[in-house]
């Protein structure tokens, strides 16, 4: 699978042009720096994190790899925001549709966050990708626990 996060973001935005996102190349570079050589990018999307306002300050790139979930946002003046979440920390997610845009609320053990400004057409693909990711990772976790108990 393609490891180029920016290219994956561009494909997502081309497929779903109603998604709100600014400075995509800068935000993608935050994630690109943190992807390890042995990781494979499974799914990438982009939206506005934890805000109901549509501003360039909150655009965030979300990447699912074969090992973890990554969130990255490039702030101004050289600062950046980066979060890495392992699959065992993910609980569930919720899809919401509004009048013009959709949103996804992802719940983890420590926090939950909302990604807004998503094209309503993109929600089905995002839901399918996150569901498959969660199911596959939970199966791996259960198998590992079973093997360690034996």
Question: For each predicted feature, which ranges?
Answer:
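Glycine/small-residue-rich phosphate/adenosyl-binding loop
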Residues: 36
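Flexible glycine-/small-residue-rich
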Residues: 47, 66, 73, 108
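Polybasic phosphoinositide-binding surfaces of eukaryotic membrane-targeting domains
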Residues: 57-71
């Amino acid at each position: 699978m393609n490891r180029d996060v920016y290219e994956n973001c561009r494909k997502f935005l081309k497929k779903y042009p109603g998604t709100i996102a600014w400075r995509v190349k800068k935000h993608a570079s935050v994630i690109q720096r943190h992807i390890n050589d042995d990781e494979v990018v499974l799914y990438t999307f982009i939206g506005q994190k934890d805000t109901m306002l549509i501003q360039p300050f909150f655009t965030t790139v979300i990447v699912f790899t074969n090992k973890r979930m990554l969130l990255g946002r490039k702030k101004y003046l050289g600062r950046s925001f980066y979060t890495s979440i392992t699959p065992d920390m993910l609980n569930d997610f919720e899809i919401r549709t509004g009048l013009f845009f959709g949103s996804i609320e992802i719940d983890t053990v420590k926090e939950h966050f909302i990604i807004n400004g998503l094209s309503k057409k993109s929600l089905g693909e995002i839901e399918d990708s996150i569901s498959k990711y969660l199911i596959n990772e939970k199966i791996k976790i259960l198998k590992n626990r079973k093997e360690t108990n034996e």
